[in-house]
Amino acid sequence: MGKRPIIIGVAGGTGSGKTTVAKEIFYQFNEKSIVLIEQDAYYKDQSQLSLEERLQTNYDHPLAFDNDLLIEHLHSLLNGQAIEKPVYDYKLHTRSNEVILVEPKDVIILEGILLLEDERLRELMDIKLFVDTDADIRIIRRMVRDIRERGRTLESVIEQYTKVVRPMHMQFIEPTKRYADVIIPEGGQNRVAIDLMVTKIRAIIEEKAVL
């Protein structure tokens, strides 16, 4: 890896399909040349709080994320240095004691709801994507995910969506759509958009290789 890595930001509301889009792009490249980093891994450490206090945290607000650490890690990767990516425990609502060693790669894919909200992160991205999906579809996907994967009850998911997730989406996430270079409708179902992005990324890689 001789040239500066390419950073692709994939943002969008919860349940929009942004994770699917990010993974579909990821799978089109050799694993030795690409890495996927989730913004969720950079939720702030809340180990000093009780579980009851952690449950009151607004996880859809920009202040829930430790973007300072994420930016520090991105600069390290850009400079050819490995990082120790934190691992977030969704059931305990704080960071676990584990970390994942991430080596620098030619392509870095960032994925998260509020990636485009922080100007410092936007400035590091070569391509900014926003995955745009109907709100009804997003809430259904969130319900299924949180109940199956994160040990939540249906009642708690609905309450969180109406009181926190939807208001935060309208206030903080939806406005970041204007920063996107490309808006992808229908999330991971949009094969045309995903294939176009892969082609564009390959072109950027080839362009950097001859500079």
Curated annotation (Swiss-Prot):
The gene is udk. One of its GO terms (molecular function) is ATP hydrolysis activity. It is found in: Cytoplasm. This is Uridine kinase. It is an enzyme of class 2 (transferase). Belongs to the uridine kinase family. Its EC number is 2.7.1.48. It comes from Halalkalibacterium halodurans (strain ATCC BAA-125 / DSM 18197 / FERM 7344 / JCM 9153 / C-125) (Bacillus halodurans). It catalyses: uridine + ATP = UMP + ADP + H(+); cytidine + ATP = CMP + ADP + H(+). Gene3D superfamilies: P-loop containing nucleotide triphosphate hydrolases (3.40.50.300). Pathway: Pyrimidine metabolism; CTP biosynthesis via salvage pathway; CTP from cytidine: step 1/3; Pyrimidine metabolism; UMP biosynthesis via salvage pathway; UMP from uridine: step 1/1.
